Structures are given as C-alpha cells and as structure tokens.
Amino acid sequence: MNERLATAAWVVWTALRAEQQGMRTRPMVVVVSVVQPVALLAIVAGTRRLTADRASVVVSAVVLTAIWSATVWTAGGVLRRERTYGTLARSVTSQFSPSLVLFGRSLGATLSSTAGILASAAVVIVLLGLRVAVPHPLWLLVALLVVVASGTALGMLLACLFLVTRHGLAWSGALIYPVFILGGLLIPPDALPQWLRWVPTLLSLHWVHEFVVGLSSGAVRPAPLAVAVALTVVYLVAAVACLRVAVDTGRRRGSLELV
C-alpha cells in the first residue's frame, strides 16, 4: 500500500515538474499570469477610490477571473498540446495511470499560473496603494487551497473535453469571455438578467468569490466554500470518467487521435 502511494506521488510530482518546465517557453503563460491580471486590476481598481473591504472584493474577482483564463489556456490545453507534439499515446498508455499523469500536469500548470497571478496582483496593489481587508487570513489560505484544487480539477476536465475535438483551440478562446460576463466574478450575479443568474452557480470559482466577499466584511460563511469543494469533486470525477472513455475509444480504434 505504501509503495503504491509512493509510486503515485512520484508520478504526480514528475508530471508536475515536466509541465512547469514546459510552461517556461510558452508566451501565453506570461499573458494570462501577468499581463491579464495587471490590466484587469489596473482598470477595475485604478480608476476609483475603494474602501478596504471593497478592494478585497475587487481583487478577489480579478484574481479568480485571471485564474479561470489561465486554467483554460494552460491546464486545459495539456492533452491538446500532447496530441500536437505527438506524445499523447506515450502519456496515456504508459504503465502509470493516465489520470495520475493528467492530474500532475494540471496541478503543475495551476500552481505556476496561480503563483504568477498572485504575484502580479500584489505588485499592482502596492503600486496603486490599495488597502485590502484580510480579517481572517487562515480562512483566506483555505480558500486559496480550494482554488488550486478546483483549478486543477477544472483543468483536467477541460483538457479531456478539448481532447475529443479537433477544434480545442477554438473552444479555448470561446470559453473565456462568456465566463468573464456570466461567471459571477467581475459582474455580480444580481446584475445579470434573471434568466441567466443560475449560470454562476455551476462555477466553483464563483462560490470561492462569495466566500471571500463574506470574509472581507468579517463574516466566515463556510457554505459557499463547501459548494466549491463539492463542485471540485464533480469536476474531478467527470474528468477521470471522460479521460477513461477517450482513451478506451482511442484504443478500440487503434488510434489516439480520438476524432
């Protein structure tokens, strides 16, 4: 049992490091992890005076929006890039579980992009002189861990969905801005048309943002964070099932192009 856990941890760590090394050569990583959060935060927070609690809400919305974008373009593109480079079959048919490999790569992408986004946001906060309210730092750390877990699971799911179509790159671009508008982050759900207010409830990052909104006013409301965790589990289970179906289909056809 211990040997199997050690092997699984080694597989995840190796995949994580491989993905992080590959990210160093991709210009898109700089765009989604540095340029985008800096631009969004400068536009949203730099054009008006904000109270400390309101600044916390704005920073949370911008950071989570940037993490969504980074998830789509980095973790969400893991398997699509493998297919482009011709290494997909080796990644998903080795002696190790393809789910573990994908988890490690998605986790590596999520950690790197999240670190870049947080660092970029911190620089802008200092330059703009924003006062950010953090009344419960430990709970904020818990929320950050949920964000990393959720981004990893969501990245795995998107990677599997993008894999089963030759138009994954187009879908990546198409998914960005609808969530910017309908994700309940930059635009509050109550500002959306009544018939669209259910959309943000499907996004775990929206629930993390709701939790942070409560924290900024001094209230600890575990319910939104619990919903985010539940959605993360749903994303992960769906991703593993989707990957298994995709790989099995490729094996039956004798090809891992899958489409």
Tell where the protein language model's regions lie, with residue ranges.
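Hydrophobic transmembrane alpha-helices and immediately adjacent juxtamembrane helices
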Residues: 1-259
